[in-house]
A protein has these predicted regions:
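Polar, low-complexity export/assembly segments characteristic of proteins
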Residues: 4, 91-181
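General secondary-structure propensity
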Residues: 25-29, 180-189, 208-213
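Amphipathic, well-ordered alpha-helical segments in soluble domains
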Residues: 59-62, 66, 164, 192-195
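The cytosolic transmitter module of two-component sensor histidine kinases
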Residues: 18, 154-157, 217
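Structural signature of extracellular appendage/secretion-system components
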Residues: 4-106, 182, 200-203
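Long heptad-repeat coiled-coil stalk/signal-transmission helices of membrane-anchored sensory
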Residues: 29-32, 39-46, 142-145, 151, ...
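Proline-poor, low-complexity alpha-helical tail modules
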Residues: 1-9, 191-244
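Intrinsically disordered, low-complexity segments enriched in Gly and acidic/Ser/Thr residues
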Residues: 163, 170, 174-198, 202-203
Length: 244
């Protein structure tokens, strides 16, 4: 009788241990999945920003080429109008580059958020939002208030374009650094998912965590694929908006 009665608390302890493990496992699994999702969105935002900055650099390149060939414009007002068109396109890219309706490479006075923040359970990542339209606006002001028949004025505008292009390159590089940090963290998080899966498998082999069967190696591999595919879909959607 004593043996039978003593087995009850032992079984209860075993059951409690199993339930505790399952709860902890599920909590950790969900936490890692949310982390991957946040990091994935951050990486996609980075790629969107860089794609748009590349387009903006093309427009600045067009402006620079037109300034270098200013003599081909008999009426310098025609040159200004042509430059203005590129600058308008530059700004259009800036204001159409959004993620979840939020501007990424443009800000204004009324913006609540002046930075892009990616938060996970273990780390927070942040990059200041660039206000790229200021580059185009400054070139616009200088160009339209200058006599482009004057070679000195022409060089001043050209110099301003070069400076803006360099600043834009720095912004691109900042996003590269930001993206690299996110990608490293994402890989570490997915590695943690693999480790969690392996740990869970060992415990299941010992008859623990029998109820926790929905997280398999397939899920981990799927996360790797999701990371790339989801980013591609987000970036592609942005590209379609910019081209339309």
């Amino acid at each position: 009788l004593e043996k039978v009665s003593s087995s009850k608390p032992i079984n209860k302890i075993s059951e409690d241990s199993t339930n505790l493990y399952i709860n902890e496992y599920n909590k950790k699994r969900d936490e890692l999945s949310l982390n991957v999702q946040s990091l994935n969105e951050g990486i996609a935002i980075t790629k969107m920003a860089q794609n748009s900055i590349e387009k903006q650099q093309e427009y600045l390149g067009n402006v620079q080429t037109k300034l270098e060939n200013a003599n081909s414009y008999e009426d310098k007002n025609d040159l200004k109008q042509s430059i203005n068109e590129d600058l308008r396109n530059f700004n259009q890219v800036a204001y159409e580059t959004k993620f979840k309706k939020e501007n990424i490479i443009a800000t204004n006075y009324y913006d609540d958020k002046k930075s892009i923040d990616i938060n996970t359970k273990n780390a927070n990542f942040s990059i200041e939002k660039p206000n790229t339209p200021t580059y185009a606006n400054e070139i616009f002001e200088l160009s339209n208030n200058s006599d482009l028949n004057n070679s000195t004025n022409l060089e001043q505008v050209s110099s301003k374009v070069r400076t803006s292009s360099n600043q834009l390159k720095n912004t691109y590089d900042d996003f590269t650094e930001f993206g690299n940090k996110l990608e490293f963290s994402a890989k570490e998080t997915i590695k943690a998912q693999v480790d969690l899966y392996n740990e869970n498998k060992i415990n299941k082999d010992r008859n623990f965590g029998q109820e926790s069967t929905d997280f398999s190696k397939t899920n981990v591999n799927a996360n790797l694929g999701y990371l790339a595919a989801s980013q591609a879909n987000i970036v592609q959607a942005q590209s379609v908006r910019l081209l339309s």
